[in-house]
């Protein structure tokens, strides 16, 4: 019976996604279909409704709309150009300097805004025309932009890590945030190494050396934006406020910065920005609610144990099992966005990882790093589509230039997977674990 429930649940879900039904409704319909095999219609309907309500009845979920609104304000607040100017001062004399500026700016902007798509649009939209004027191949510039925009998703504050924390049963958000720093930087360095090698071979120019006055101005212009990370993380680590309270403080700080200090966001723009944030939040919360129901159905049908037994039947070597999990997640990332993938597959793979002795924080970072790569991969790679639309490069012309960056990111993923201290060193150093 359990096998029929599993086939119904996943079969219905993937068929609905394939024919274009929104993922949140695909999850909900598949959950109802599987529960009808377990309960009568009236009990199944009540159970789904209860699980949907329970999935949203969590105070920590308030962090998501606040961080989303903060990110929306940042996207329109003139922060990207200030971070780009700072990055140019920092790496302007490295071969292929504008490529490295792109990577560094994406890391900073992505971590502050929490959105790879926003980072790709803001940074790529500013730098791609400049790179083209200086002789950079547009496909190469786009490949650098697309592959680096994902690195900021691991560097806190990160909405995806909050979603993982809630799905994993309350794994410490502070531990996840601090664990994301080194893996995020590692993925950024991997992209920069490939960028530097290709740029040196092609003879791409260096930027002009910044004077001390220019460097000071760039730093001071970007400092208010960078302070947001220190305020949020310092407050969480210092026990001054929780991650949820930090998200509200991030909104207040970003509002002051964008509206009153930089004055890039006008009062008349606020209703539109609020509406954008509400729409995005609605999508995430609906996914979260339905995914709780799906997770309950999977657990009730012993699906995680069935998958665990299947994996353990292939090999009892933890290294092989983790490799298989990574392969499955890479395939999932090709067809599914990060948030639904985290919501659906965390309840399946986290128990297996814990059975192997893997820390939940380490697993969360590995999972998010893995799914980040899916943002670069068609047919659902949102960062890929945005990067191409910004630069005007066709996707088919971008696949070959992206391959070296894919390889570098996969090497970084394997290091994150098999070297736990890359993720756990900072949380352990700070006494969070």
Predicted regions and their residues:
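Alpha-helical transmembrane segments of multi-pass membrane transport proteins
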Residues: 1-433
């Amino acid at each position: 019976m359990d096998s029929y429930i599993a086939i119904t649940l996943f079969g219905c879900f993937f068929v609905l996604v394939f024919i274009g039904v929104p993922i949140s409704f695909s999850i909900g319909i598949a959950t109802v279909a599987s529960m009808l095999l377990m309960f009568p219609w009236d009990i199944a309907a009540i159970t789904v409704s209860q699980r949907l309500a329970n999935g949203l009845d969590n105070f920590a979920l308030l962090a998501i709309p606040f961080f989303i609104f903060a990110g929306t304000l940042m996207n329109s607040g003139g922060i990207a150009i200030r971070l780009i100017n700072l990055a140019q001062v920092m790496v302007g004399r490295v071969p292929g300097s504008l490529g490295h500026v792109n990577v560094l700016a994406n890391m900073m902007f992505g971590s502050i805004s929490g959105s790879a798509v926003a980072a790709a649009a803001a940074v790529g939209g500013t730098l791609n025309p400049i790179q083209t004027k200086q002789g950079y191949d547009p496909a190469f510039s786009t490949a650098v932009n697309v592959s680096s925009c994902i690195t900021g998703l691991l560097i806190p504050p990160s909405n995806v890590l909050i979603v993982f924390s809630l799905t994993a049963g309350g794994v410490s958000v502070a531990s996840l945030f601090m664990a994301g720093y080194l893996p995020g930087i590692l993925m950024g360095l991997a992209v920069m190494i490939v960028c530097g090698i290709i740029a040196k071979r092609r003879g791409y120019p260096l930027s002009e050396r910044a004077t001390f006055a220019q460097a000071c101005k760039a730093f001071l212009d970007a400092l208010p934006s960078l302070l947001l990370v220190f305020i949020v993380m310092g407050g969480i680590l210092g026990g001054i406020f929780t991650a949820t309270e930090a998200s509200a403080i991030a909104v207040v700080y970003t509002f002051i910065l964008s509206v009153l200090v930089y004055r890039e966001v006008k009062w008349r723009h606020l209703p539109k920005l609020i509406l954008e944030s509400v729409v995005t939040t609605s999508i995430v919360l609906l996914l979260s609610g339905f995914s709780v129901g799906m997770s309950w159905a999977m657990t009730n049908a012993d699906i995680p144990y069935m998958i665990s037994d299947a994996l353990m039947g292939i090999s009892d070597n933890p290294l092989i099992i983790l490799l298989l999990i990574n392969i499955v997640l890479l395939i999932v990332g090709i067809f599914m966005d990060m948030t639904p993938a985290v919501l659906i597959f965390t309840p399946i793979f986290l128990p297996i990882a814990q059975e192997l002795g893997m820390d939940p924080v380490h697993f969360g970072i590995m999972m998010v790093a893995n799914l980040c790569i899916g943002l670069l991969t068609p047919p659902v790679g949102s960062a890929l589509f945005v990067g191409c639309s910004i630069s005007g490069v066709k996707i088919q012309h971008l696949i070959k230039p992206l391959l070296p960056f894919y390889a570098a990111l996969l090497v970084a993923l394997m290091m994150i997977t098999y070297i736990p201290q890359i993720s756990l060193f900072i949380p352990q150093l700070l006494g969070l674990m």
